């Protein structure tokens, strides 16, 4: 199968590598011509994964038409806040009844749309098939063939079973689920909680605080998910609990790094400038905070992170307020 991968960051590159290793014909669509030349000549993505070698059959291009020519599947690994514009640009080049798999994690700030909602709006009338790939998966570990398990959400169970074979190779194992909404929300909301975990660790609050944040963060993810039509059980799986634990504890997590840097006294602007790759959780915090108010869902950790990130609240004050909330049953 020929697959076009849109997004030349670390995750798009790692998935292109995985698919090529699984005997797929992979073209990686990137923004920068210099980056494309380096990938094609040296099999290295110098900007995002400089220390690992891409599969030799991965081809990079900056040309949309070249990437999508003959492709039977489009894999989108583009940051959520730019996702809609890229999909709009690519739509005229898609084949009839396209298969689109998304591997980005976030919620649009402007329209409060999830990834699946953006695809449904932009590909309306195309007869497209949609799936969402999510779970605990640092790109560099996938590149190094370290054991990894993820989940692919697809409303049609038979299609999900077919696609999970395409996205499984070596020590990379893909499960399938029909709960697309749960899979995409777990991947998005966990980034908000990861910022909180990084902040708590950076302030020296200890392991107890981190465990509490992860556990109560999972409750927030589940409450919002159920309010938006997801199954609560999905959040106990790889795209929920799995991704939450990894992102809150692993120092390769960009969102955890945001919290750690804020704890050092950096401003959000300084943190953003210091990071080469996008930390989706900063924008997602704003979107989730607005959704929670609209749906009347209680998300205290998210609310605290919104106040810290977007209202300038002192992080220590935010934590004190969280811990002094009215007592209740778990």
UniProtKB/Swiss-Prot annotation:
Example GO BP: glycerol-3-phosphate biosynthetic process
Binding site for NADPH: 10-11, 31, 105, 139, 254, 278, 280
Uppermost EC category: oxidoreductase
Cysteines engaged in disulfide bonds, as pairs: none
Signal peptide annotation: none
Subcellular compartments: Cytoplasm
Main location: cytoplasm
Key words of the record: Cytoplasm, Lipid biosynthesis, Lipid metabolism, NAD, NADP, Nucleotide-binding, Oxidoreductase, Phospholipid biosynthesis, Phospholipid metabolism
MF term (GO), any: NAD binding
Residues reported in the UniProt entry to bind sn-glycerol 3-phosphate: 105, 135, 137, 190, 243, 253-255
Catalysed reactions listed for this entry: sn-glycerol 3-phosphate + NAD(+) = dihydroxyacetone phosphate + NADH + H(+); sn-glycerol 3-phosphate + NADP(+) = dihydroxyacetone phosphate + NADPH + H(+)
EC number: 1.1.1.94
Pfam families, per the entry: NAD_Gly3P_dh_C, NAD_Gly3P_dh_N
HAMAP family documented for this protein: NAD_Glyc3P_dehydrog
This protein's name: Glycerol-3-phosphate dehydrogenase [NAD(P)+]
